[in-house]
């Protein structure tokens, strides 16, 4: 079994890449694919780049070129719910686009308006979070091609689809995985509250996301070990 592990930014995958053994690296389509073993399992780790197009293209490459049989996307997101806080995790039970006309998208394979996380991968993620002492919520993730960093945009997304967090890649990864019948799950550690404070910290001041990424890295490593 080959497990594909993705992130959108280098910081989101660097810690995982550092854990790999027997590593080979291939540059393909502008993306570095790190093949190796993690907890004795064959994995391919890559930084897809930000946004839906990058995420979709890289997911297909992982499946077609590298034979990924399961996909785990790990990274950070903006919190949209009072049920959790900064540093906590959302596990994607459902993932959808907040910036697309869903009744148009669902006219093509896989004919879905939203995408379900794989039950076995969700269970593995829930167990890994519990064992790591990380508070996790299995819920809804919304994806769009913008960084949500103001209250007005946040409120509009809340009114449209009421997600638990918002990010820029998950639905695209999930759509391509579903199209290929490959099990997939999206994991997100909360780095901000998708408001003005988040924009100031992450965009203006370029604050380090290492502590949030470390949470996601621990969870993914534990999941791979359990699979």
Where do the PLM segments sit?
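Short, conserved "active-site rim" segments that organize catalytic pockets and cofactor/ligand binding
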Residues: 1-20, 42
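Glycine-rich phosphate- or other oxyanion-binding loops that anchor nucleotides, phosphorylated ligands
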Residues: 2, 26-227
